[in-house]
């Protein structure tokens, strides 16, 4: 015992026991003492055997599960060895995935002491959270969406093609009605259509605007010929009424393709009206210029004639005066 106590006394100098006091003790000590102290160092009597029991290296704590593994090569090798030694592969592959929880014995020497989930369940959870499955599902959904879009696009294309085909057919029929020859089935329909065209031409002629010069020149003719003036006095409304009455009687001629011809005739008549008005204006200008030139020529001729007459009269008077003077 004496030798053991001597050993303890020799070890006392090597070890220092540091004790941290509480806040209340510090307040009491500061009140009792003049100078404040935060820490207090005391020497404790410890034996080497007790030191061996209390202190343990980090590897032992790691094996007991009291320390987390550090990311260092030796510790990683230890973890790999522990995982290789721990046999749970047979249990995992022997049981199906859809079964319930499998209780596996966990020893105190393994670092899985804090885990309450079995390895099979952990693998199942990891398989449920596998990103490849989610990518496959996402790709399948994308393919379905693409198929739906393709079906819609094909439907739209077919609808566009059908609408374009109908438009092209309608335009072809319309153009054929312009350039095709109109075939009259009945003589009465042909005669009525010809009479209608003649009436339209007469209406367009009556509705034409005549230039100013032609109106001046044609005034005495209209006054002399009462029949012509009566025909020109026909109003546009009367002609339109007659045209409406004839169009109601000639519905069969419209079905044979006379509408495009009437449209063409109206367009040509409108263009001819514009040309006639332009030509009438040009003629009016020319006629006014010619009249002015004639008036100038006539005035010059009159002036020359008057001058010549006055000169001849003056000469005759002079001759008579000279004769009287010689006689007297």
Curated annotation (Swiss-Prot):
UniProt GO MF annotations: kinase inhibitor activity
Name this polypeptide is given: Probable membrane-associated kinase regulator 4
Biased composition (Polar residues): 223-240
Main location: membrane
Superkingdom of source: Eukaryota
Gene Ontology CC annotations of this record: plasma membrane; plasmodesma
Keywords associated with the record: Cell membrane, Membrane
Segments for region (Disordered): 213-253
Subcellular localization(s) per the UniProt record: Cell membrane
